[in-house]
Amino acid sequence: MLTLFSYFGFLFAALTLALVLFIGLNKIQLI
């Protein structure tokens, strides 16, 4: 159970980081 929770936590963190990088690149291109 704890392993499954850790896996989803890691996946959520990876998706969040990817989203932040994607938004950051878009802001750089808009400037």
UniProtKB/Swiss-Prot annotation:
GO molecular function terms noted in the UniProt entry: electron transporter, transferring electrons within cytochrome b6/f complex of photosystem II activity
Membrane topology summary: Single-pass membrane protein
Major localization class: plastid
Residues spanning the membrane: 4-24
Localization per Swiss-Prot or TrEMBL: Plastid, Chloroplast thylakoid membrane
Keywords from the UniProt entry: Chloroplast, Electron transport, Membrane, Photosynthesis, Plastid, Thylakoid, Transmembrane, Transmembrane helix, Transport
A GO CC annotation given for this chain: cytochrome b6f complex
Annotated signal peptide: none
A biological-process GO annotation: photosynthesis
Record-stated family: Belongs to the PetL family.
PANTHER family, A to Z: CYTOCHROME B6-F COMPLEX SUBUNIT 6 (PTHR37266:SF1)
Complex and partners: The 4 large subunits of the cytochrome b6-f complex are cytochrome b6, subunit IV (17 kDa polypeptide, PetD), cytochrome f and the Rieske protein, while the 4 small subunits are PetG, PetL, PetM and PetN. The complex functions as a dimer.
Role according to the record: Component of the cytochrome b6-f complex, which mediates electron transfer between photosystem II (PSII) and photosystem I (PSI), cyclic electron flow around PSI, and state transitions. PetL is important for photoautotrophic growth as well as for electron transfer efficiency and stability of the cytochrome b6-f complex.
Name recorded for this polypeptide: Cytochrome b6-f complex subunit 6
Record gene name: petL
